[in-house]
């Protein structure tokens, strides 16, 4: 019954999101129409803008409207929409929402430190399910929003830990990204980015991670509050890296649990993604941490189900379907380059110190 309710609520979020801000072609045929559209967009998204900024922002908005409009006229497997980022330049968008320069942090931290083992290596590709969706299995919490803090690495880490914890304990618990932002600072850099594998090892060495309720997200670099560690803890036993540049290996991992992945999200098509299988422009300059929570196919195109952390109004209720099995070994947007997942051996967690675990289902 709970799973049916979860699927219904997820479908409702997708429907509500799809019915968001829209426009008529006539509104973009004149300067006056575009100006009215911009004011309507600002009201819809409650975007605060000073009068002094309006002309500059309107110019950016006009450019983005035409990009969305012209892209949607083409016969592509995905669509764009005017979301909350519509009056940001691509550079402003990248600086604010894709600030985790994975390559930079990889150079600072050196080679990967995960186990050289890959526990799913033995899996037979031909026997894997044709599609997997961990949302429908109740292993994914509701979509979260990192805001203008470059903490995507923390959200990616937490999504993977929430998933394996549900799989092992049958309890879905929303965990604290802010604890990682504030406390995992020896090598990761809070709102200035980080690496998911480092965060997994922090959680292991720290004895676990606390809940979202105990240590709520603030979207800023704060001082580590050790007292908030006294709440419920979810533990892991380490992590493993998925063999890089190998989408088949990634498929084996995602078939078994949600996986942290890094991607290049710094394109206008990604900025305004709305629905469908994303085959748009993106490179391999990894700048954003997300989570692969499933895979499938649509009209003959294979895709990854990727959970983002930009709120439910972006994409398909906060998710994007990224094309799967392309010619390049790195995968679309570099999705196969930096994948890792947490290991959890036990089917239980430490006894709660303050009340019971809150099951999100």
Swiss-Prot record:
Enzyme Commission code: 3.4.22.-
SMART domains in the record: Inhibitor_I29 (SM00848), Pept_C1 (SM00645)
Gene Ontology molecular functions: cysteine-type peptidase activity
Tissue: Expressed in roots, stems, rosette and cauline leaves, flowers, buds and green siliques. Found in the tip of young primary leaves, in very young root tips and at later stages in all tissues of lateral root, including the vascular bundle. Not expressed in lateral root primordia, while directly emerging through the epidermis.
GO cellular component: endoplasmic reticulum
Propeptide: 21-127
Disulfide links within the chain: 149-191, 183-224, 282-333
Residue numbers covered by motif Prevents secretion from ER: 358-361
Transmembrane segments: none
Keyword Disulfide bond part of the UniProt annotation: yes
Domain of life of the organism encoding this protein: Eukaryota
Keywords assigned: Disulfide bond, Endoplasmic reticulum, Glycoprotein, Hydrolase, Protease, Signal, Thiol protease, Zymogen
PROSITE patterns: ER_TARGET, THIOL_PROTEASE_ASN, THIOL_PROTEASE_CYS, THIOL_PROTEASE_HIS
Catalytic residues of the enzyme: 152, 288, 308
InterPro entries listed in its UniProt record: Papain-like_cys_pep_sf (IPR038765), Pept_asp_AS (IPR025661), Pept_cys_AS (IPR000169), Pept_his_AS (IPR025660), Peptidase_C1A (IPR013128), Peptidase_C1A_C (IPR000668), Peptidase_C1A_papain-like (IPR039417), Prot_inhib_I29 (IPR013201)
Signal peptide range in chain numbering: 1-20
Keyword hit for Disulfide bond: yes
Protein's cellular compartments: Endoplasmic reticulum
Glycosylation: residue positions: 75, 124
BP GO annotations: proteolysis
Family per similarity comment: Belongs to the peptidase C1 family.
Described function: Involved in the final stage of developmental programmed cell death and in intercalation of new cells. Cleaves extensins, thus probably supporting the final cell collapse.
This protein's name: KDEL-tailed cysteine endopeptidase CEP2
Organism: Arabidopsis thaliana (Mouse-ear cress)
Gene (name only): CEP2
């Amino acid at each position: 019954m709970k799973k049916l309710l979860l699927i219904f609520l997820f479908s409702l979020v997708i429907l509500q999101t799809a019915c968001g801000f829209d426009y008529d072609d006539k509104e973009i045929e004149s300067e006056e129409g575009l100006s009215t559209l911009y004011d309507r967009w600002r009201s819809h998204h409650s975007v605060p803008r000073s009068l002094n900024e309006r002309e500059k922002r309107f110019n950016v908005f006009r450019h983005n409207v035409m990009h969305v409009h012209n892209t949607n006229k083409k016969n592509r497997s995905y669509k764009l929409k005017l979301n909350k980022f519509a009056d940001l330049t691509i550079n402003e968008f990248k600086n604010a929402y894709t600030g985790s320069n994975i390559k930079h942090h990889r150079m600072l931290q050196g080679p990967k430190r995960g186990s050289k083992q890959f526990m799913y290596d033995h899996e037979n590709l031909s026997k894997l399910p044709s599609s997997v969706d961990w949302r429908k299995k109740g292993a994914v919490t509701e979509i979260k929003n990192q805001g203008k803090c470059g903490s995507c690495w923390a959200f990616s880490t937490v999504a993977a830990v929430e998933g394996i914890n549900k799989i092992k304990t049958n309890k879905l618990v929303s965990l604290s990204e802010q604890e990682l932002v504030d406390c995992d600072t020896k090598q990761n850099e809070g709102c200035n980015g980080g690496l998911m594998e480092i965060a997994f090892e922090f959680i292991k060495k720290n004895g676990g991670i606390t809940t979202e309720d105990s240590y709520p997200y603030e979207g800023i670099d704060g001082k580590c509050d050790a007292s908030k560690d006294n709440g419920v803890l979810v533990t892991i036993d380490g992590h493993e890296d998925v063999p890089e540049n190998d989408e088949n290996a990634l498929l084996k991992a995602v078939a078994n649990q949600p996986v942290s992945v890094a991607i290049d999200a710094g394109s206008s098509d990604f900025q305004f993604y709305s629905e469908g299988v994303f085959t748009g422009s993106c490179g391999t300059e990894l700048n954003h941490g997300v989570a692969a929570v499933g895979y499938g196919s649509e009209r003959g195109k294979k895709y990854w189900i990727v959970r983002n952390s930009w709120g439910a109004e972006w994409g398909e209720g906060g998710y994007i379907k990224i094309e799967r099995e392309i010619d390049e070994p790195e995968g679309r947007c570099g999705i196969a380059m930096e994948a890792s997942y947490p290991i959890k051996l036990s089917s239980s967690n430490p006894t709660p110190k303050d009340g019971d675990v809150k099951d999100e289902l």
